[in-house]
Amino acid sequence: MLSCFCWETVTDWEPCFLRDWELQVHFRIHGQGKKNLHGDGLAIWYTKDRMQPGPVFGNMDKFVGLGVFVDTYPNEEKQQEAQKRRYSPGVQRVFPYVSAMVNNGSLSYDHERDGRPTELGGCTAIVRNLHYDTFLVIRYVKRHLTIMMDIDGKHEWRDCIEVPGVRLPRGYYFGTSSITGDLSDNHDVISLKLFELTVERTPEEEKLHRDVFLPSVDNMKLPEMTAPLPPLSGLALFLIVFFSLVFSVFAIVIGIILYNKWQDQSRKRFY
């Protein structure tokens, strides 16, 4: 399995603290593989951590942030062929397929189902082996996530995904990654261009759009992360052991007193 990464910020190698932004991605996917004999696609990220190699298009699973996936290989379709199709044809997706996922670190990306269980939305995007430029834009304005494509050679954006109520913290990193397995393809990221968008907000919107510290989507329940308990200090451990011993001694003394009292009462019955 081969992975390729381009993990960096678009603004001077620092985290992105823009409130409203637009990321334009100029990319190209091409190769010699015929239908469904190529893979696996590329991902564009806005995440808390820099690149950590893993199974999700080359990045770590259970990431924290936003992932946008240009998936070129239909894993679920192959599963369905083997299992007599678990879904009706009406819900089949045509690949290549673009989807988005917001994660707070608690969710796993399901490769066998091409991310369907955690998908915010998606669209078909025929992007392989085209003879003109292909672009993808991710726009985040007033907690509104919009993804558009320019893949027809007409220099026109067409809607792909639109999700309101997306809450993304500031200070995360932009990056791209790709991965191949038994099949392969060429995934070229030609440019990443980040733009700050100037947006006016009413006082009410200012209150509603305060900074958040964990990614989430309104009306979508994400499992809460449970923080591990901090290790006990030496003093705390000593106090626990000390009071446990005191309690044990106290219990033994009470037990002896009650036993002696019971014996005295037993003797009185015989005299």
Map each language-model feature to its residues.
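Polar, low-complexity loop segments and adjacent catalytic/binding residues used for recognizing
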Residues: 1-271
